[in-house]
Amino acid sequence: HGDQEVLNKIASEKIEKDNLIYVNFDINTNYIERSTCLEETGLELSEKVDYESYLREVARSHFILSPNGNGIDCHKHWEALYLNPVPIVTNSINIQHHKHLPFLILKEWRDFKESDISEAKYASLMKGFNNENLFFQNYCKELGWIK
């Protein structure tokens, strides 16, 4: 979906986090899931922007709302983790395999309003997280495929 060079550039800039939550996705990718997400959270979509501007907004946010798209694995989850906001997601088989990563996992979108969405919660979820663990070689080591 994205441009790896632009993603790496934004990641290297170490942008200060000054936004609590960012909401930007194409509602039509999975209309039922994503419209439910917006209805239940009470949040509004941000204005559509180009990819680099989108990544800058992701990088300056503590959390991003990341509903599933066409499947249970969404590139927004991984872009967010690489740029260090916490993706807010609903539980799925895929998310269960990544419990060691800093996701804020909701059973359903209606649970959002009772969730702790704060800078303190962000710090708690991110404690000890190193996005280098997302790199393929490190992931293979974690799975025991290479030493």
What is each of the regions a protein language model found here?
Residues 1-105, 116-147:
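Nucleotide-sugar donor-binding catalytic core of glycosyltransferases
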Residues 109-115:
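A short acidic, often aromatic-flanked loop/helix-cap motif at beta-alpha or helix-coil junctions
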